Regions:
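Extended, compositionally biased alpha-helical segments that mediate assembly or anchoring
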Residues: 643-716
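Bacterial Sec-dependent N-terminal signal peptides
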Residues: 1-22
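N-terminal structural segment of carbohydrate-active enzymes
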Residues: 75, 116-159
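Contiguous, structured surface segment used for ligand recognition
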Residues: 21-116
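Coil residues (strongly favoring Ser/Thr
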Residues: 8, 20-21, 41, 49, ...
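Catalytic-core regions of glycoside hydrolase
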Residues: 39, 88, 94-103, 122-126, ...
């Protein structure tokens, strides 16, 4: 490992050590939050080690967890819970924690060491698709989950608008100009990445104040748990009003993003790092942010997310990255720059020479790259391991929170092993860059386990998953879950969303999954297992609603054929069944709170102090999971969710509109006009986003009993 990288890791260790002086007490407090009264059966001890390490053993009726810091102690506790208590801890506060009546003993002492120093978590997008409405109640448990899984580098970008508000005021902007620059709360992740300004704004001042308070709570707890929060740095994104008031700046208009109506209204401005003003803004921001929140010297800066750079000239790219880093180092001499690599895969124009110029413009060891989507594209393989800069292997999993049955345990397990073997000494960590949380959680638990020298094969890990779902060892369940992983979750897909959650029409692309028959079989096998565990019930609902969505797709294909054949009778029969399937899926998803829209809406409205403010936040919440932007084309349904309220009040009415329009056309002897229907559909979608369509929530039922009824109805 080169000297620069060693220096980087040592600085992280020093920072963490300074922030966590009482690890045992911190771990005990976490155990009480997770275990309640059963926390008294667990004892924590601190040991010296140059690596993150924990041991487990039983002594005098207690489980003794010894580790080098509170983060490792939490990881040790989770290892005990998963492998001895058969208990999985969800990242959602409201999901139950189900423990055995008697906490089991550890028969033989276990010692496990970390193989990688960096364990990164989160994504700018997660702050829009899952986190915008959370309070300290949800965050406290979420941070506990991070610690339980060994996360020590969380992206921590809550509350940065308060910092920017103060900075832009110093540079002459007034309240209205600043708040109108910011987007609405659900869209701040993309505003922070310099994708667009102002959309769904202006941002309420009360929101900024409360987010500032929340960020202080978040950072305090993360630092107590030996984490290095990744704060924001200045990437070059400046308000249009700032450019107007400071003449002669060297800047450019960023390329359009997001297919908005009136795109110029939302277009971003990018200040060149070579302009003297860049370093002034960087220093002002870092100093103000440090005053507000402290610093751990790790900053996320992503200047070109899904937009073109000002130039692709290699010398200019090297100068640009050097300028960003030097401005950062001038404000904080210990600064490290964390950057995601997504845009270098996503955007055309980035070849190896250009990436090398950009990455090597920063001193070796001071730029840390997130290899963002490694289950599909491992960029370290095509960039000479990021040309020597430290990198983190990341599992992305989902786009927009579209809850497909995707959790490729085989690729995670084997690809990381291959990275250990071949990537070189600058392979520095693993991370999760998920866009949203409404997905299969267990793959992330395995991901972070791979940062440690955990014993066991891939099949043993799958067996452990079944044990956690059952709360016991059950060989029948183990086989079902091994099949679930191998035949469904591990199967590669070229898309990550379902037909139900996309706008209907005659010209839709083929989206039928290659695992449809396997899904039906495993759903049937799963409902015949016997468990009261919440995670098991969630799995039953998850695979069941996917089976229903695949059945809907089959019906749609037949409906299109019937339309082409002028078979009106068959169209009516199929159309009626399509509507019924959507209603049944809404009923099934209402069986588990993970699939409820009610929590999302109630949390959004809770941030408002008046009816007007509550409606403002709900409009943000509704739009981002439906239309997304303000146009009939572009990002619509990108963040579609299989939620009960969306199914009953959005997808079902929209699907019914399509069925009824097609039938009406055949009855009247005219051809169906797709463009006309899309416009009609968009009018309904906008009414939903503007709160003109009420959300109905189906009554909750028993998921296993309802699944048996639906299996008999659709799969026999």
């Amino acid at each position: 490992m080169n000297r620069r990288i060693i220096t980087t890791l040592c600085l992280m260790a020093v920072t963490i050590g300074m922030m966590a002086s009482n690890d045992v007490k911190t771990a005990q407090n976490l155990a009480r939050r997770i275990l309640g009264n059963k926390a008294q059966t667990v004892v924590f001890k601190k040991i010296d080690s140059t690596k993150d390490v924990f041991t487990l053993e039983s002594n005098l009726g207690k489980v003794v967890i010894s580790a080098n810091n509170a983060n490792s102690m939490a990881m040790g506790l989770n290892h005990y819970l998963k492998n001895y208590c058969h208990t999985a801890i969800s990242w959602y506060k409201d999901d139950p924690i189900e423990l055995p009546e008697t906490m089991p003993a550890v028969k033989e002492k276990v010692r496990i060491e970390s193989r990688l120093p960096m364990r990164f978590f989160l994504n700018y997008c997660t702050y829009g698709y899952s986190l915008p409405w959370w309070t300290w109640r949800e965050w406290e448990h979420f941070i506990d989950w991070m610690a339980l899984n060994g996360v020590n580098m969380p992206l921590a970008i809550t509350g940065q608008e308060s910092t920017w508000y103060n900075v832009w005021k110093k540079f002459g902007l007034n309240d209205e100009e600043i708040r109108s620059f910011f987007s609405g709360p659900a869209y701040l992740g993309w505003h922070r990445m310099c994708n667009f300004d102002a959309f769904m704004g202006p941002l309420p001042r009360d929101w900024m104040d409360r987010q500032q308070t929340l960020q202080k709570q978040i950072l305090k707890r993360q630092r107590e748990l030996n984490m290095t929060p990744v704060l924001s740095g200045f990437a070059g994104h400046v308000p249009a009003k700032f450019v107007e008031k400071h003449k002669g700046l060297k800047y450019t208009d960023v390329s359009y993003w997001g297919s908005f109506k009136d795109p110029e209204r939302y277009r971003c401005r990018f200040l060149f790092a070579t302009d003297p003003m860049f370093a002034k803004i960087q220093r002002a921001f870092i100093e103000e942010q440090t005053r507000m929140y402290g610093t751990d010297h790790m900053y996320c800066i992503d200047p070109f997310n899904e937009v073109d750079p000002p130039t692709f000239n290699c010398d200019s790219l090297a100068m640009l990255s050097r300028g960003i880093y030097e401005s950062l180092a001038a404000a904080d001499k210990d600064a490290h720059w964390l950057q995601m690599s997504w845009t270098y895969k996503y955007m055309p124009g980035w070849n190896s020479e250009r990436m090398k110029a950009l990455f090597r413009g920063v001193p070796q060891g001071r730029l840390i790259m997130l290899d963002y989507w490694c289950e599909n594209v491992q960029m370290w393989k095509t960039t000479e391991s990021f040309y020597g800069q430290p990198f983190i292997w990341c599992y992305l999993n989902n786009f927009g929170g579209r809850n497909r049955l995707v959790a490729p345990s085989d690729r995670i397990y084997n690809y990381i092993d291959n990275t250990y073997e071949k990537a070189g000494s600058n392979f520095s960590g693993v991370g999760a860059t998920l866009e949203a949380l409404d997905v299969n959680q267990f793959a992330f638990s395995m991901l972070f386990d791979k940062a440690w020298n955990m014993p066991g094969s891939l099949n043993e890990w799958r067996n452990s998953l079944a044990d956690q779902r059952m709360g016991r060892i059950d060989e029948k369940a183990r086989k079902v879950y091994r099949d679930y992983c191998e035949r469904v979750l591990d199967v590669p897909r070229t898309y990550n969303y379902t037909f139900v959650e996309s706008r209907p029409g005659m010209k839709k692309k083929d989206k039928c999954t290659p695992t449809r028959e396997a899904q039906n079989e495993i759903w049937k096998e799963m409902v015949n297992l016997n468990s009261d565990r919440d995670g098991y019930k969630m799995d039953v609902v998850n695979i069941g609603r996917q089976c229903l969505e695949e059945h809907f797709y089959v019906l749609w294909r037949k409906f299109v054929v019937a339309y082409d054949c002028y078979d009106l009778k068959e169209m009516k029969r199929l159309g009626s069944e399509m509507k019924e399937v959507l209603a049944d899926e809404a009923a099934l998803t209402a069986c588990h709170p993970v699939f409820s829209m009610k929590r999302w809406i109630e949390q959004a409205r809770s941030w408002g102090n008046s009816a007007e403010e509550k409606d403002y936040y709900e409009r943000n919440a509704r739009r981002i999971v439906t239309v997304w932007n303000n146009n009939l084309a572009g990002l619509n349904d990108y963040a579609g969710r299989p939620w009960d309220g969306l199914l009953k009040s959005f997808y079902l009415p929209r699907g019914s509109m399509f069925v009824d329009r097609a039938i009406d056309c055949r009855e009247r002897g005219i051809e169906y006009d797709e463009d006309s229907f899309v416009k009609e559909c968009y009018e309904f979608e906008e009414k939903f986003c503007e709160l003109e369509v009420p959300i109905e929530y189906p009554q909750k039922q028993d998921p296993v009993q309802l699944s048996r009824q639906l299996l008999k109805k659709y799969c026999e």
